[in-house]
Design a protein with these regions (language model features):
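Catalytic cores of nuclease domains that cleave nucleic-acid phosphodiester backbones
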Residues: 53-175, 198-207, 316
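Short amphipathic alpha-helical face segments that pack within enzyme cores
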Residues: 49, 187-195
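Short alpha-helix boundary/capping segments
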Residues: 41-45, 177-187
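Active-site-adjacent bridging/hinge elements
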Residues: 19-29, 162-169, 250-255
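Nuclease catalytic cores
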Residues: 2-59, 103-104, 275, 279-285
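Residue-level detector of short, conserved catalytic/binding motifs and their immediate flanks
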Residues: 151, 190, 278
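Short small-residue beta-strand/loop micro-motif enriched in glycine and branched aliphatics
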Residues: 29-32, 173-177
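Metal-dependent nuclease catalytic regions and adjoining charged, substrate-binding loops involved
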Residues: 116-117, 125-127, 143, 181-182, ...
Length: 316
């Protein structure tokens, strides 16, 4: 299966939420997301539009300008997105690094770990389709999972030989979702550094940078701000553990799909339905039950945020 950070994190939080957001059948495909109301500016839509504007900006700085993306039909969203990118350009009129790549989508095959012991040191090649784990006597297929995502900016610090990568995160003014303590513990830095090593080999990969864009206040009385970029390093052991954990999650998702499918309600983590600072996107139907009215008025088919058509699969 193909798995990204968002899907893995949602499954960790609640398998039933993962099913609703990634696998629930719709006429357009798989998965549901909340439907914006009127001119509401959703965090997901604003983040997507901001990524388009940042892609234009960094390609401009790189010297390879691209055709501008169409403006959003949501006037409130477009106004806020333009306000943020204008302030961002003023904050960073130039960068002190060489831009190598912008908005790079990727598909990297995850390691073949035995689904019983999650080790790879005693694998025996049986044929081009399967391995035998001599530790536990278990046969399993090769290449069962692929890690997918998009690296926002790949760059080389001036005078340095290694490549660093940067990820942009847009959040509300008072949010603490991207504070340094959270990023110090997150797996994304480890996983992206692992993927970058495969994508850009034989280049040496250095550090992961978090670039937070804080939205203006709700009534626009305070402008957007951009905290100092966070710089994260990871040890080989941290990277190896994060990759192993992702393989484990992907195996669990496949196991749940086999056991529960579309006919039986998936297990859920009810402790996370209401976290104290917000509710799960599917709190209403999971608490009071699905109805046609809730489905039509509250949800829409999920829009894919990764365009992976034609993106080659890379072996690490």
């Amino acid at each position: 299966m193909e798995i990204d950070n968002s899907g893995a994190n949602i499954f960790r939080r609640c398998p039933l939420e993962y099913y609703e957001s990634a696998l629930k059948p719709t006429q357009e495909g798989l998965g549901l997301e909340p439907k914006p109301h009127g001119f509401e500016v959703s965090a997901l839509d604003l983040g997507g539009r901001e990524h388009e504007l940042l892609e234009e900006y960094y390609n401009e700085l790189k010297g390879t300008p691209i055709q501008p993306y169409p403006e959003s039909l949501n006037e409130a969203l477009e106004m806020e997105a333009q306000l943020i990118i204008t302030a961002y350009r003023a904050k960073y009129p130039q960068e002190e690094f060489e831009i190598v790549d912008v908005e790079r989508p990727f598909r990297v095959v995850l390691p073949d770990l035995c689904p019983h012991c999650y080790q790879k040191d005693m694998l025996k090649n049986i044929d081009d389709k399967q391995f035998l784990c001599e530790r536990c006597g278990y046969f399993f297929p090769r290449g069962r999972h692929t890690y997918v995502g998009k690296i926002d900016v790949t760059f080389r610090m001036l005078g340095m030989g290694v490549l660093d990568i940067m990820d942009h995160k847009t959040e509300k003014r008072r949010s603490n979702s991207n504070r340094p303590q959270k990023w110090a513990a997150r797996d994304q830095a480890s996983l992206y550094l692992w993927a970058a090593k495969a994508i850009y080999k034989p280049e040496e990969i250095g550090r992961f940078h978090v670039n937070v864009l804080k939205r203006p206040s709700e009534k626009f009385q305070e402008p957007p701000i951009f905290p100092d970029r966070q710089t994260l390093e990871r040890t080989p052991e941290q990277i190896e553990t994060a990759v192993r954990d992702l393989v484990f999650i992907a195996d669990d998702i496949e196991r749940y799909k086999h056991i529960f499918g579309d006919k039986i309600t998936w297990p859920s983590n009810r402790e996370n339905c209401d976290s104290g600072w917000g509710q799960c996107d599917f709190y209403l139907p999971h608490t009071f039950g699905w109805s046609e009215e809730i489905r039509e008025n509250r949800y829409q088919p999920k829009k894919p945020y990764l365009k992976l058509e034609g993106i080659p699969i890379i072996q690490p």
